[in-house]
From Swiss-Prot:
GO terms for molecular function: antiporter activity; choline transmembrane transporter activity; thiamine pyrophosphate transmembrane transporter activity. Keywords: Antiport, Cell membrane, Glycoprotein, Membrane, Transmembrane, Transmembrane helix, Transport. Residues 55-227, 272-307, 378-452, 520-557, 616-635 are extracellular. The chain crosses the membrane at residues 34-54, 228-248, 251-271, 308-328, 357-377, 453-473, 499-519, 558-578, 595-615, 636-656. This is Choline transporter-like protein 4. Its main location: membrane. Choline transporter that plays a role in the choline-acetylcholine system and is required to the efferent innervation of hair cells in the olivocochlear bundle for the maintenance of physiological function of outer hair cells and the protection of hair cells from acoustic injury. Also described as a thiamine pyrophosphate transporter in colon, may mediate the absorption of microbiota-generated thiamine pyrophosphate and contribute to host thiamine (vitamin B1) homeostasis. It is a multi-pass membrane protein. It catalyses: choline(out) + n H(+)(in) = choline(in) + n H(+)(out); thiamine diphosphate(out) = thiamine diphosphate(in).
Length: 707
C-alpha cells in the first residue's frame, strides 16, 4: 500500500534533493534558450525595418489634416493660414456617403471642398438678382472667401455656380476634426428632393459621432482646474495600497477569516432569498412546464425551477466552503503565514513596489511604436488624382475621360461644367503597398510578442528579488545589497531567450483568439446555431488554454530566476512541484485572490467615494485652501481618479501577488530539500515552522540564526 502511494507521489517527479551549495538564486549560470534569443533579436530587427519602411512610405498627414478637392492639405504648407475644410454642399456627403469614410479617406464626397481660414458664421444664399454680378462683387468684396483658389474676380456668379467654383449657399458652421459642419439648429435652405428633417438628423448624428469642439474645450478646462486634485487622489491610492500591503503582516489572519465569514454570510443570504422566491412561486404554481422554451431569459425569473436550481448551487458552494474551513484549516493558516511573509519581504525590498513603473514605461513604448507603425503603414502610397464632374451627363462632358489620372497642378481647360482634378486615394503598387497586409500582421505579432516579453521580464525580475529574500538565512543581513537591480541585470544577461520563448507561446495563443474573434465578427450575420456553438466552444477552449499558459509561464519564470535553467526544464519542474502540492496551490491561490480583490476594492472604492464627495462639493467643512474647483463635468476627474487608483492598486498588488507565488514555490522547495537538521535547516519563518509542527534542530549557537 505504501509502495503504491510512493508511486503515485512520484508520478509528478521526484522531490528536490538537498544541495549543500544551494544558497538561493544561482549566480554562476549560463545563457538559456539561445536559439529563441537569436530569433527574438532577429524579429526585433525586422520590426525596426518595418518601422523604417513605414516611415519612408507613410504619410500620416492625410489622417491628421483634411484635404481639399485638389488633394492639398489644410493647415500646412500653402494653406497654413487655412486650417479648416469647407464642403460646398455637405448634404450630399451626409445623405449619400459614409461619414467615417470621409474622415479617413479624404474626398469620397461628391462636392467641391476648399480650405478656409474660418468657418461661416451666418446663413447666406445667392439670390437670383446676383447671378449677373461678378464674383468680386458677391464673394470677395463681402469677405466671403470660400471659392476655389484661382477663380477670377470678373467671372459672372452664374458661371461660377454652374462650374461649381463657388458655393451657392453658406450655413453657420462649427469646426470639428478640421472640417466645417453646420449647426444643428441652423436654417437650412430648400434643396430639391431633400427634406429639412433628414438634413437636420444627418447633421446631428455627424456632430455627435465626431464630437463637438466646445466639449473638448470644456474637458480641457476641467483638467486644467482639477489636475492637482487628481494627482492628490492618485497619491492617496498609492499610500493606501502600500499601507494595505505592509499592514498584512499584522492583520492578514483576522482579515482573511473575516472575508471568508463574509463570503459565507453572502452565500447564506443568497440561499435564504432563493428559498423565499422559490416558495412564493411554488405556491402560485409557476412552473417551467407552463412557460415552455423561450429566448427571453428574463422570463425564467418567474418560474420556481430557476430559483430551486440557484438555491442548490449556492447550497453546494456553502457546503464546500464549510468543508474547506474544517478540513483545510491548516493549509489556510499556511496561506495566511505566506501572505504575512510576503508583506515582510516587500517591506525589506521596497524598491520592488515601484518596478511596475518600469513595466508601464516599457509597455507604453511597445504600444506607441506599434501605433506609429500602423498609422504610417495605413497612409503609405503616392496620391492619385482623377477627373471628376458633379454631372457627367451635361453637354461637353461626354468626351472627358472621367476617373482617369490627371495632374492637379495643371489648369483644367474643358467645356464640361464643374470639371476638376480631385484627389481619389493612394496607389497600391509600391513596395510597402503590395505587402501592406503582411506588414500589418507582422506589426501586430510584434505588438503581442513585445508586450508579453515585457510582462515576462517584470515577473522574472521580481521573482529573483523575492527569492533572494526567502533563501537569506539571516534576514535582512543575508539579503543582497541590490536584489532588484541584480535580478534585472541577471535576467537580461542570461534569460532573454527563455522569456522570449514563453512570450512567443502565449502570443501564438492570443493571436489565435484574435483570429477567432475576427471570424466570429465576420460571420455573425450568417451564423446558424450550430456554427455559433462551435465558435463558442473554440473560444472557450482558447481562453482556458491562455489562462493555463499564463499560470505555467509565471511559475516557470520563478524557477528560471532561482535556478537559471531553460524555459522547458523550468516549466516542467514548476509544474511537477505544484502538482505534488496541488491542494496547497488551490487554497493559496483562492485565499490570495480573495485578499487582493478586497484590497483593490478598498483602495478604488475609498478613492472613488472621496473624489465624488469632493468634486461634487459635498464636503462643506473644507477651507478655501481645499475648496473644490468649479467644473463643467464633475464626473470626469472622478472617473480619472478611479481609473488611476485601479491602475496603481493593480500595479502594487501584482508585485505582492508575484511575491506570494515566489515565496510559495520557495517554501515547497524548502520542505523537499531540507529536514530541519543542523546541516539542512529550514529557511522558512518561525510562524510557518510552528504551523507545520517543525523546527530547526541546530546547535545552541545556531538557534539564534532565525529571527
Amino acid at each position: 500500500m505504501g509502495g503504491k502511494q510512493d508511486q503515485d507521489k512520484e508520478a509528478y517527479g521526484k522531490p528536490a534533493k538537498y544541495d549543500p551549495s544551494f544558497r538561493g538564486p544561482i549566480r554562476n549560470r549560463s545563457c538559456t534558450d539561445i536559439i529563441c534569443c537569436v530569433l527574438f533579436f532577429l524579429f526585433i530587427l525586422g520590426y525596426i525595418a518595418v518601422g523604417i519602411l513605414a516611415w519612408v512610405y507613410g504619410d500620416p498627414k492625410q489622417v491628421l489634416y483634411p484635404r481639399n478637392s485638389t488633394g492639398a492639405y489644410c493647415g500646412i504648407g500653402e494653406n497654413k493660414e487655412k486650417p479648416y475644410l469647407l464642403y460646398f454642399n455637405i448634404f450630399s456627403c451626409v445623405l449619400n456617403t459614409n461619414i467615417i469614410a470621409i474622415a479617413q479617406n479624404g474626398l469620397k464626397c461628391p462636392t467641391p471642398q476648399v480650405c478656409v481660414s474660418s468657418c461661416p458664421e451666418a446663413s447666406w444664399t445667392v439670390e437670383p438678382r446676383q447671378f449677373s454680378q461678378t464674383v468680386e462683387q458677391v464673394f470677395y468684396a463681402a469677405n466671403r472667401n470660400f471659392c476655389l483658389p484661382g477663380v477670377p474676380g470678373n467671372m459672372q456668379v452664374l458661371q461660377s455656380l454652374q462650374q461649381e467654383l463657388c458655393p451657392s449657399f453658406l450655413l453657420p458652421s462649427t469646426p470639428a476634426l478640421g472640417r466645417c459642419f453646420p449647426w444643428t439648429n441652423s436654417t437650412v435652405p430648400e434643396l430639391p428632393g431633400i427634406s429639412n428633417t433628414s438634413i437636420s438628423q444627418s447633421i446631428s448624428g455627424l456632430l455627435d459621432s465626431l464630437n463637438a469642439r466646445d466639449i473638448s474645450v470644456k474637458i480641457f478646462e476641467d483638467f486644467a482646474q482639477s489636475w492637482y486634485w487628481i494627482l492628490i487622489a492618485l497619491g492617496l491610492a498609492l499610500v493606501l495600497s502600500l499601507l494595505f500591503i505592509l499592514l498584512l503582516r499584522l492583520v492578514a489572519g483576522p482579515l482573511v477569516f473575516v472575508l471568508i465569514i463574509g463570503v459565507l454570510g453572502v452565500l447564506a443570504y443568497g440561499i435564504y432569498h432563493c428559498w423565499e422566491e422559490y416558495r412564493v412561486l411554488r405556491d402560485k404554481g409557476a412552473s417551467i412546464s407552463q412557460l415552455g422554451f423561450t429566448t427571453n431569459l428574463s422570463a425564467y425569473r418567474n418560474v420556481q425551477e430557476t430559483w430551486l436550481a440557484a438555491l442548490i448551487i449556492l447550497a453546494v458552494l456553502e457546503g464546500v466552503l464549510l468543508l474547506m474551513l474544517i478540513f483545510l484549516r491548516q493549509r489556510i493558516c499556511i496561506a495566511i503565514a505566506l501572505l504575512k511573509e510576503a508583506s515582510r519581504a516587500v517591506g525589506y525590498i521596497m524598491s520592488t513596489m515601484f518596478y511596475p513603473l518600469v513595466t508601464f514605461a516599457l509597455l507604453l513604448v511597445c504600444i506607441a511604436y506599434w501605433a506609429i507603425i500602423a498609422l504610417f503603414l495605413a497612409t503609405s502610397g503616392q496620391p492619385q488624382y482623377v477627373f471628376w464632374a458633379p454631372n457627367s451627363s451635361l453637354p461637353g462632358c461626354e468626351k472627358v475621360p472621367m476617373n482617369t489620372s490627371c495632374d492637379p497642378m495643371e489648369q483644367v481647360n474643358s467645356s464640361c461644367p464643374g470639371l476638376m482634378c480631385v484627389f481619389q486615394g493612394y496607389q497600391s503598387t509600391g513596395l510597402a503597398q503590395r505587402s501592406l497586409f503582411n506588414l500589418q500582421i507582422y506589426a501586430v505579432l510584434g505588438l503581442f510578442w513585445t508586450i508579453n516579453w515585457v510582462l515576462a521580464l517584470g515577473q522574472c525580475v521580481l521573482a529573483g528579488a523575492f527569492a533572494s529574500f526567502y533563501w537569506a538565512f539571516h534576514k535582512p543581513r543575508d539579503i543582497p545589497t541590490f536584489p532588484l537591480g541584480s535580478a534585472f541585470l541577471r535576467t537580461l544577461r542570461y534569460h532573454t531567450g527563455s522569456l522570449a520563448f514563453g512570450a512567443l507561446i502565449l502570443t501564438l495563443v492570443q493571436i489565435a483568439r484574435v483570429i477567432l474573434e475576427y471570424i466570429d465578427h465576420k460571420l455573425r450575420g450568417a451564423q446558424n446555431p450550430l456554427t455559433r456553438c462551435i465558435l463558442c466552444c473554440f473560444k472557450c477552449c482558447l481562453w482556458c488554454l491562455e489562462k493555463f499558459i499564463k499560470f505555467l509561464n509565471r511559475n516557470a519564470y520563478i524557477m528560471i530566476a532561482i535556478y537559471g535553467k531553460n524555459f522547458c526544464v523550468s516549466a516542467k519542474n514548476a509544474f511537477m512541484l505544484l502538482m505534488r502540492n496541488i491542494v496547497r496551490v488551490v487554497v493559496l491561490d483562492k485565499v490570495t485572490d480573495l485578499l487582493l480583490f478586497f484590497g483593490k476594492l478598498l483602495v478604488v472604492g475609498g478613492v472613488g467615494v472621496l473624489s465624488f464627495f469632493f468634486f461634487t462639493g459635498r464636503i462643506p467643512s473644507l477651507g478655501k485652501t481645499f475648496e473644490n474647483p468649479q467644473l463643467n463635468y464633475y464626473w470626469l476627474p472622478i472617473m480619472v481618479s478611479i481609473l488611476g487608483a485601479y491602475l496603481i492598486a493593480s500595479g502594487f498588488f501584482s508585485v505582492f501577488g508575484m511575491c506570494v507565488d515566489t515565496l510559495f514555490l520557495c517554501f515547497l522547495e524548502d520542505l523537499e530539500r531540507n529536514d530541519g537538521s543542523a546541516d539542512r535547516p529550514y529557511y522558512m519563518s518561525k510562524s510557518l515552522l510552528k504551523i507545520l509542527g517543525k523546527k530547526n534542530k541546530g546547535t545552541p549557537g545556531d538557534k539564534k540564526r532565525k529571527k
